[in-house]
């Protein structure tokens, strides 16, 4: 008899934990979101994808795995320079338009790739606290 783990339980468990890894569907250039980004932005899409990867990396260690939508702060994190907030805004807005990021009701920047891993990792944490062994092949004893 097993009890399933809800997404709310998973989110609560992984809220302030750094995600150890992030699974991405590769190659990125074959995703529908990237194709849309490429159609709209041309060669700038490759820079946008670099920004997206950096934002994903930042979000994996940020509490709640969502970033504040503060372009000055994002520019500092992305470029190491506070004066580039308009460039950060341009990239982030392009990612939002392509569906690679979205704004939450709380005004934070969420990344769907991170959200998926956040819930998956939270379920692993909850499952681990319940004890037991994961189901797998039973080994034969000789």
Model feature map: region roles:
Residues 116-142:
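Basic DNA-binding region of bZIP-type proteins
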Residues 1-122:
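Positively charged, structured surface patches that bind polyanionic biopolymers
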């Amino acid at each position: 008899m097993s009890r399933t783990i809800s997404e709310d339980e998973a989110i609560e468990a992984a809220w302030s934990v750094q995600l150890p890894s992030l699974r991405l569907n590769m190659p990125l250039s074959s995703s529908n979101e990237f194709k849309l980004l490429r159609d709209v932005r041309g060669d700038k899409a490759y820079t946008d994808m670099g920004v997206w990867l950096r934002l994903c990396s930042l979000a994996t260690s940020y509490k709640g795995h969502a970033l504040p939508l503060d372009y000055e702060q994002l520019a500092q994190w992305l470029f190491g320079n506070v004066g580039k907030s308009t460039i950060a805004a341009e990239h982030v807005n392009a990612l939002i338009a392509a569906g690679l990021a979205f704004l939450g009701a709380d005004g934070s920047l969420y990344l769907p790739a991170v959200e998926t891993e956040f819930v998956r990792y939270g379920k692993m944490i909850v499952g681990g606290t319940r004890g037991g062994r994961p189901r797998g092949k039973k080994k034969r004893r000789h």
